[in-house]
């Protein structure tokens, strides 16, 4: 029968017959590479026979036959006809998956079009396969389309390596977890001011130790004050409050510092006073030593400030030979 069809160019009839027979062996026979009529037959399967059927099993056997014959480009033609041309199988999840995956393997230029046109595929799985095949823009497009925004920005940061685009994306979707991911990446690149802005937008103080270290190293004191004020609202950590006092001293916000230490807090005020003293920030040190009634250190600080009368008064309160000698 196949021979008669081939000899008389009855490829349309042959294609319909093969689709309805659902016989893998017959398919294997006609899809062999040495069949001189293979191309004409495939054209009729794609254009006519398969688009006429409404039987899922007929579609399944035909698709498997093309896969078994290792004809990825022809399989793409076949699946395009079924999935993209509004057939009854257009929304079939496995066929949509197969079309995209076959394109990833055989014709990468089509992948982006399929991703954008189709809506019913296994997005996270397909995106991860795209990543493993270095199709990063395609993976980003999938995650963005299905609103998996944390994964989308991860692709921009880790695979595409473009923090400017990551920032634009974070601005557009404006979700705290997305800002947090961006902030972590910015901090790793030593973009301290930008990282702090992102952490504040995320309302996420979790990386406070790394932020403090980076801000100390890069002298981002103004930004650090903003970050630690946000962090303090979320967690009354002793470390956060201690570093906030020091940052206020570094930015010369002495009235805010005085107000802070006068209220309830968990800060190590003595420790910050010593740091201020060592860095020559005597006005701040004076406020802090006064707050913890450390009259010996206060007397030394007042001497540095040239406030000798007050230094004598503090020396008297300290009642220490060493302090008297210094004064």
Listing of model-derived features with the role each one plays in the protein:
Residues 1-327:
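Extended alpha-helical solenoid/arm regions of large eukaryotic scaffolding proteins
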């Amino acid at each position: 029968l196949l021979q008669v069809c081939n000899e008389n160019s009855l490829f349309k009839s042959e294609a319909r017959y093969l689709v309805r027979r659902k016989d893998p062996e017959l398919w294997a026979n006609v899809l062999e590479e040495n069949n001189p009529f293979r191309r004409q037959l495939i054209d009729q399967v794609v254009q006519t026979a398969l688009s006429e059927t409404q039987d899922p099993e007929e579609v399944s056997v035909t698709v498997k036959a093309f896969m078994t014959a290792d004809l990825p480009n022809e399989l793409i033609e076949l699946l395009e006809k079924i999935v993209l041309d509004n057939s009854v199988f257009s929304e079939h999840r496995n066929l949509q998956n197969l079309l995209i995956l076959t394109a990833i393997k055989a014709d990468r230029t089509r992948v982006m079009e399929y991703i954008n046109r189709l809506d019913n595929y296994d997005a996270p799985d397909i995106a991860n396969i795209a990543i493993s095949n270095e199709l990063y823009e395609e993976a980003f497009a999938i995650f963005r389309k299905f609103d998996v925004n944390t994964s989308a920005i991860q692709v921009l940061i880790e695979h595409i390596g473009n923090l400017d685009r990551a920032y634009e994306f974070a601005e557009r979707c404006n979700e705290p977890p997305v800002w947090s991911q961006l902030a972590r990446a910015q901090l790793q690149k030593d973009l301290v001011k930008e990282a702090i802005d992102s952490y504040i937008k995320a309302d996420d103080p979790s990386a406070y130790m790394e932020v403090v270290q980076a801000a100390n190293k890069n002298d981002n004191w103004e930004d650090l004050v903003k970050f630690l004020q946000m962090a303090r609202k979320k967690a009354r950590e002793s470390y956060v409050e201690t570093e906030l006092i020091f940052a206020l001293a570094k930015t010369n916000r002495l009235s805010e510092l005085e107000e802070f230490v006068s209220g309830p807090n968990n800060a190590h005020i003595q420790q910050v006073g010593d740091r201020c003293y060592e860095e020559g920030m005597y006005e701040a040190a004076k406020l802090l030593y006064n707050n913890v009634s450390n009259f010996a250190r206060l007397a030394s600080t007042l001497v540095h400030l040239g406030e000798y009368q007050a230094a004598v008064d503090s020396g008297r309160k300290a009642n220490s030979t060493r302090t008297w000698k210094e004064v």
